[in-house]
């Protein structure tokens, strides 16, 4: 029978000093012997997705203590990728994921916590906490802050829905007047919560549902809606139940590694492909799988991407639907239900509610249940009122969206495409693969051959795009922006946004060893592995080289002979695999990240051979 980890510091005469300190935190005599549960919060005033989380830890803690546990809250850092975008701050975004994972491990292990509730929301925070949960393998429940409402404004007397990407794109479009840019800026992000489309933050919070580590509705219920409060209350109660089952009943099936098995990772990836999620999720799932010691690789992603259809298109892949519309259509349980009916889901994986994922679908899929409470839950909608307060409104749609032919979520029969929303491409320029969000690619450019134009940094690429160097037919190469080469593997949202703003969104391709924001769409191919700094072929491309991209056949080729590439490689070996003439100040923290980082196909995690 497992014993409470916290007994190390709460039991026995020799722990009198530790107990004295525990008492100073508010613990009483009868608290010693109860499970100590870490409430891992990520409140910060820097990030709209986290600005409302200050009081969430208290909500969870009250439920933990009422159910018989002891709650102890601490905070992690949180980086806002949108605010860090387009300058040196973006170099810190991906490394913050690993720092978050480490900080959670440090706090939980230093204080011998027995379990944890992870309160996350935005891009690197959910993955960092997920990596920590897999690493620690103690009972854990995830509950996120929720998505913000979509922005709305009138342009040319027409009401349109907006998000962060619209503000970025229109600001670079010289045909849009200053007044319209101002109106968009002031309307794009109206409430607290993670940005309103299927960007990285919302994608990851949806995937925790598929992994079985969060509650139904976690990925889609709006941050502002009163119904979201119940997710936090339930998380607090449920973590105590998981503690009882593990520590009192010796039931290891409640542990994260027992829930997030390889089958669960496949479910999460299938969901990601079906909903056209952010390409960053590939990076983070690979990293979490390594922490869980699950053999889940790019080969599995490639296999799944060839058979899972695209069942939902949400911003940035369309301006018609945002996360509030996904929720109205039944949320993640509805998409998983369609995958189950298409025989594309492992229905027997477990969840933190003690059910199988199949049992959860039967209970929460709006097309299967007539339960009025479930339908009411998924009718929760936006209020259209600017606010930074959670649970501040109780607006509801009149009906749910259960139209699986033309609605936000489709059945396999009426899928947006039988080919999924994400694809892995391989070829001589990406021997270990690269990733493209096919849900955001226009059908006219699924096959594309063009001339390379090479940039050694994101900044140089932005200057080239806005300066008129990039023309229709170009394949824009941005290299030395991978985990090592950046270092930090910054996102390339500005280059893709600017290509669209100058009318080249369907006329060019972009290939990088860096990564893309969840807000990216178009023929934008990232995670090219091996990266240039590791001797990848992308480091050998020269201006004017032909590159052939064939998404249907999952191929990407540099049309240069092997003999010529061998000559170039020898020359580059002599020079060293570094960007030419790039001026970039790199801190010691970033140098350390780059030194240990693997390429994107390994999740950009630490290379253990260097430890």
From Swiss-Prot:
InterPro entries: Dihydro-acid_dehy_C, DihydroxyA_deHydtase, DiOHA_6PGluconate_deHydtase_CS, ILV_EDD_C, ILV_EDD_N, IlvD/EDD_N. It is an enzyme of class 4 (lyase). This is Dihydroxy-acid dehydratase. The active site is at residue 517. Homodimer. Belongs to the IlvD/Edd family. One of its GO terms (molecular function) is magnesium ion binding. The lineage of its organism: Bacteria, Pseudomonadati, Pseudomonadota, Gammaproteobacteria, Pasteurellales. [2Fe-2S] cluster binds at residues 122, 195. Keywords: 2Fe-2S, Amino-acid biosynthesis, Branched-chain amino acid biosynthesis, Iron, Iron-sulfur, Lyase, Magnesium, Metal-binding.
